[in-house]
Amino acid sequence: MLPDQAQFKRLIEIGIALSAEKDTNKLMERILLEAKDLGNADGGTLYIRTEEDTLRFEIIRNDSLGLAQGGTTGEEINIPPQLMYNEDGSPNEKQIVSHAALSGNTLNIADAYESAEFDFSGTKKFDQGTGYRTTSVLTVPLNNSQDDVIGV
């Protein structure tokens, strides 16, 4: 089987598995883990949009750090939600996750430390505290069947 055919087959298998999953925590975790695997990513975070228009950390995974919080782990995530709007009501365009949620666009940053477009100070603080070095960041909005962004 050719690589493109294998990837297409895998996406179909993932889609079938996701449509069959009834447990929301397992479903969200599977989405994140499959996205990490498809993107060959070391880490990933799933945010859920709240009624207050914030993005709540729902699941965090980082293979190098052995970090697994949220989802089915039972490990609480003690990080405040990301604001989608600033205090003055303007869109929070400096945070990549809120920008993706507000615009509905997928964003791919080659190096978070070289980006002038977005504020990665939270990422850098995490890196300093753990000894990790975040490199590329792929941010993908998650839409429901009505095409509303429900997470990132």
Task: Kindly give the residue locations of the regions a language model identified.
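Signal-transmission linkers at sensory-effector interfaces
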Residues: 1-30, 37-38, 59, 150
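GAF sensory/regulatory domain recognition
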Residues: 45-91, 114-115
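Signal-transducing coupling segments at domain and membrane junctions
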Residues: 92-98, 105-106, 110-136
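A short, aliphatic-rich beta-strand micro-motif
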Residues: 135-144
